Every structure is written in C-alpha cells, then in structure tokens.
Amino acid sequence: MLHFFLPKDLQPIFEYIPSSALHVVGWSSVLPSIITVGRRLAFDEGKHEMIGNLTPMLPPHVQFSTEHQHDHHDEHEHAEHAHTGLIHAEHIGDSVADKERFGVTVLEVFFSQLFSEAGFFIDLREHGFSLNSETVFWNPPNLWYHLDHNFRTGLIKVYDGYFFGPFSYAEEGLADLGILTEDHAANQKVVDLLLSHFGSDGERNVLFEIDPFAKSFDQFFSYLKEKNISLDANFMYFGLYLVTLYICLDKLKVPLDARTAFLNARNRLTKEKPDSQEEPAVS
C-alpha cells in the first residue's frame, strides 16, 4: 500500500527496504512526510535553499551543479562530455583509480551531509554525478529530508564509536537513536548488523555490495522487532539514504575506505574531537 504514496524516484530504492521494517517503523507517522517529500520533488520546492545550505558542507573537490542532469544520457551527449573531459558516473569506465576516487568521494558526501542541521539530499545514486580530472559535480534529485537533531548527532556518535572507539560512545549514539538496550552484547549486535559492511579497524578497504547489505538490513530490523524496539520516520529516511549509497558503490566493484572518508568529513566539519564526549559542533 505504501508504494501508492511514494514518489516515482523512491520506488526502486524502497525495493531494498525489508518487509521486517514494516513491523518496526511507525508508518502512520511516515505517510505525511512521504507526501511532503513527494511534493518537493514534483514542484522543485526548496532545492535552491538546500544547495545553499549544503554547499559549505561538501568536500572541496565536490560542487553542486544544475547543468549536469541526472537523467540517463544519450551517446551524442556522452561523446560531447568525453571531448571536454567530463564523464557521467554511469560511464566511469574500468579505471580502478577513477572508481576509487569517485567511490571515496561519494562516501565523504554521505558522511558530510550527516553533519548538516539543514537537512540532506537522500539520493546518492550514480546518475546524479559527473566528474572530470579535478572536480566531482552533483545534481541530486530534489528528494531531501531533515533529520531530528538528536537522531542526526546520534548517527555521528555511532559511526565515530564504531570506527574509532570507545564503544561506549557508539552506545550513546544508540540511545539518541532510540535503540539502546540494557544488554551490552545486544547493543554490539545492533551496531554490527547496521555498520559491519563499512569495514572495521582491522579491515579498512571493503567492497560495498547491495545484496549482502540488504540481507543484514533485514536482520537488523528483524532483531529490533524481536526486542520490541520501534523506530520513527527518521530511520526510514536514513535507511533510504544508506540504500542509495550501496546502490551507487555496488556498481564500482572496488574496495573503499569508509573509515577515512568519515574521518575527513568529521575533521572538516567539527570544531572539537568527539573524544571529549561532547556533542559534535557543526561549523
């Protein structure tokens, strides 16, 4: 039933949201926001303002662009852009170096947007990106959402505690997300199910594959259902954001270092290191 309310651009993404999520997320609270997100897309509401808010958050070599459209491109257009040195990410070719550069850039964009108080563009799929030898251009569809402050900063704590420790910092983040339990082992399992595909301290470079991720995402929601933990609309939109990341990076088929991408975003966008146990400050 939910698919009837979804914007067309969201429907392929929702295919990777497991049915177990229906039992965990309160869909009655989600439906109004889906209508709002769909209206933004249909009428191009707020995109200019979002670009203005997010431009300072992006890595220095990434620029928003309305000139490099996210539609699928014909051969003539592809040839013209090849002549000028600009290629669409869908046609990135077989160069491992180019794939790594693009993939790490998308990861850093993913993490950078989590530091934005203003909201984030949901869709990181490759058809929104173009690149040349110096710059990655991004023209995302106008699918954006504003995460609640505590949820957003909780995500940052979870990633920080997972990548760098201590795990108690990740548990603080779980509390902000509303999924902290009294069982330390259960908290570890929740984090592992959600983040293990990002690699760990002992495994920096990992392949981002959509099918294994979708399986662990299902296990994540099933585990929360078993523990009678409920989630709200924030997690649904973050889940969609994760899915678009994996859809994009899955096509590259090269190992990527998410830990360093997070570190780069954190160092650019926070005034204090989180080991002070204070809430990260957004510049």
Label each PLM-derived region with a short phrase:
Residues 2-283:
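Helix-rich C-lobe and terminal helical cap/extension of kinase-like folds
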